[in-house]
């Protein structure tokens, strides 16, 4: 496993990006550490231990998805987020629940492939540079004599009419390429143009099947037809800099073993995969209406995936026995007990995420490594303007965000995005035309720009 961390270290890493929600962080940290512990056991016992899936309960915008996403990044695990409402019962038009596992395997293949390509990048760059030199200093083309078409049909060899290259010509070509290679290494040819033959990226005909529940069939047909028909290549005129990037990727593809990539990716998805099922509360119902019956059907389809089964993908059968499933929902209308009992039992760890307070909003604005105020300051700094928020101004923004959340829909930290856009709208528009080195945002400025939103309930309903 990549980055073996203790639960305390995992929580500390998550604290760099997510404010509060200690209970949820502790639960996912323990779940992750248990995976490492499981790998230390003997094979017989290891197969018996399955992950304890987690159910996160809390309003939108409090960090449910971000906790799961950051957790996956910490360990380099394949991660996929799906919405439970997108799935339909087997036999109906729509995506079937097994597609979430196929998506996870695709993500795993991409991760492993990127990792392998990084490992051969240096060798691929060397080969790409060699190809660029050959394009800049091409060898003489050999012409072929005209032959009877029937002879060509029956595979008879054509005769070269060119004389064999003399050793002097070969030495001259080698010397010219050596000099060109030296210039290339010094970066003197980066803006020169070369004509490169690359594989043509044609639009996928079967993309129309996406979302219809038939994407697996379309994928298999695409692969079958792709293997039967030769890949098209086209010529592109690129600078040496661009050509190196294109050719390096092409050479790296040749250097990696896709069978090995697939095998490793499937194993990674099975042992380390994390599936985040959002809006799981929306498929809960008491079974009194036809819609509730349909939603119950989706729950019953999800059940075997969560409790462990084998899903057929284009990379082969994939077991879900040891994947970690994290369910999440606001549960405003439905309750966790409205889920079918069998599914409730598959999410033994329940974590309730709390609503964000004024202090939480203040911390969200300034503490994380990717804090919103740091992002806006960096954007305006590209215009030569340094923007500074006073502590009082930050507190005022947090207070208004809390008030608007309480008076209208509670959308958590997402409220800050639009408030900051409204606050800095004039400044962002005028920034290229003003000659100011530093601008200080005060609580008075915040009040002037945002007070109307906080006071006017009807208006605040239009502010996301």
From Swiss-Prot:
| CDD domains associated with the record | RecA-like_HslU
Principal localisation = cytoplasm
Protein residues bound to ATP: 19, 61-66, 278, 342, 414
Concerning Pfam families, the annotation shows:
AAA, AAA_2
Q: State whether it acts alone or in a complex, and with which partners, per the record.
A: A double ring-shaped homohexamer of HslV is capped on each side by a ring-shaped HslU homohexamer. The assembly of the HslU/HslV complex is dependent on binding of ATP.
Tell me which family the UniProt entry assigns to this protein: Belongs to the ClpX chaperone family. HslU subfamily.
Give a GO biological-process term: proteolysis involved in protein catabolic process
Instruction: Identify the InterPro entries for this entry.
Output: AAA+_ATPase (IPR003593), ATP-dep_Clp_protease_ClpX (IPR050052), ATPase_AAA_core (IPR003959), Clp_ATPase_C (IPR019489), HslU (IPR004491), P-loop_NTPase (IPR027417)
Which keywords has UniProt assigned to this entry?
ATP-binding, Chaperone, Cytoplasm, Nucleotide-binding
Look up and give the organism this protein is from. Halalkalibacterium halodurans (strain ATCC BAA-125 / DSM 18197 / FERM 7344 / JCM 9153 / C-125)
Which intervals of the chain form a coiled coil? none
Its annotated function is as follows: ATPase subunit of a proteasome-like degradation complex; this subunit has chaperone activity. The binding of ATP and its subsequent hydrolysis by HslU are essential for unfolding of protein substrates subsequently hydrolyzed by HslV. HslU recognizes the N-terminal part of its protein substrates and unfolds these before they are guided to HslV for hydrolysis.
Source domain of life is: Bacteria
The protein's name in its UniProt record: ATP-dependent protease ATPase subunit HslU
Q: Which GO terms describe its cellular component?
A: HslUV protease complex
GO MF:
ATP binding; ATP hydrolysis activity; peptidase activity; proteasome-activating activity
